[in-house]
Amino acid sequence: MPPSDHPTTAPDRTEGLPSGTYRVQVRPDFPLKATAELADYLADLGISHLYTAPLLTATLGSEHGYDVVDHGQVNPALGGEEGRLALRAALDGAGLGLVIDIVPNHAGVGVPSANPTWWDVLKHGEQSEYATFYDI
């Protein structure tokens, strides 16, 4: 197709199931802002959804995000909530959906100060105020 006939954004593909995904490993050296800048390119490829690795706060220095230490916060090292909102806006503008890998059964536990709820459960067991956070 000649460049002049090539759409600049894909039709709205945010409804329904993904028909094609493109996976991005968001990490500190390729944060949410950089990922957002891919939106028009991905739309031109004809995919329906961007698929990302976990975006929640992970162990300091994590390159993959599967060692979550705060299940309630977008990782500041990736751009935080501001970065997530920018990504969402860019994808919306390009008519793309978003699939985020979540890992409720994974946690980074190596550093007590990074995951105090887990360490409190280790110390206090079922009497911990965080016992219901985990399957113990």
Give the ranges of each region predicted by the language model:
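Acidic/aromatic-lined carbohydrate-recognition and catalytic surfaces
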Residues: 2-136
